[in-house]
Amino acid sequence: MAKRGGKRTVGVSYRFHVTPGIFLNSLVPVADNSGARLVRVIGVVGHYSKTVHRRIPGAGVGDMVVVVVREGKPELRKQIFRAIVVRQRRPYRRPDGTWVAFEDNAVVIVTPEGDPKGSEIHGPVAMEATLRWPTIANLASIIV
């Protein structure tokens, strides 16, 4: 039976289980035209571990992460934003049995409510991210 998120989640509460492919301190390229080019993941929204306190938080496709801009426009650098993971290299399995893996990792910068800051998304976007975040689906040109 699929699990459904609690009140802490932002966006659509239903969450597919996706194998985490992006972890703390990962450098990830940005797939939109918000002005940021490269970000570092500094947190995963909604992640907690009751049993293992040393576990490094991981995020998969469709998860919201907290990032700091490392490369991009000077007014955006060193600023903290939230972002949605739209692609990951690590393979994950869909409920129909197919395995999906992209050739790069990518995030889209969003507001705390989940609305994208940019007006277009470059490259393909995973179906799991578009089902959980409908506003990202509106900007996506290719949905895989």
Swiss-Prot record:
Gene Ontology biological-process annotations: translation
PROSITE patterns referenced in this protein's UniProt entry, alphabetically = RIBOSOMAL_L14 (PS00049)
Q: Name one GO molecular function term.
A: large ribosomal subunit rRNA binding
According to the UniProt entry, the coiled-coil residues are none
Whether Ribosomal protein counts among this entry's keywords is yes
The UniProt keywords, alphabetically, are: Ribonucleoprotein, Ribosomal protein, RNA-binding, rRNA-binding
This protein's GO cellular component annotations are:
cytosolic large ribosomal subunit
Annotated SUPFAM superfamilies: Ribosomal protein L14
Return the Pfam families for the record.
Answer: Ribosomal_L14
* Subunit and interaction comment: Part of the 50S ribosomal subunit. Forms a cluster with proteins L3 and L24e, part of which may contact the 16S rRNA in 2 intersubunit bridges.
Tell me which family the UniProt entry assigns to this protein.
Belongs to the universal ribosomal protein uL14 family.
Role according to the record: Binds to 23S rRNA. Forms part of two intersubunit bridges in the 70S ribosome.
Alphabetized HAMAP family for the sequence: Ribosomal_uL14
Protein name per Swiss-Prot or TrEMBL:
Large ribosomal subunit protein uL14
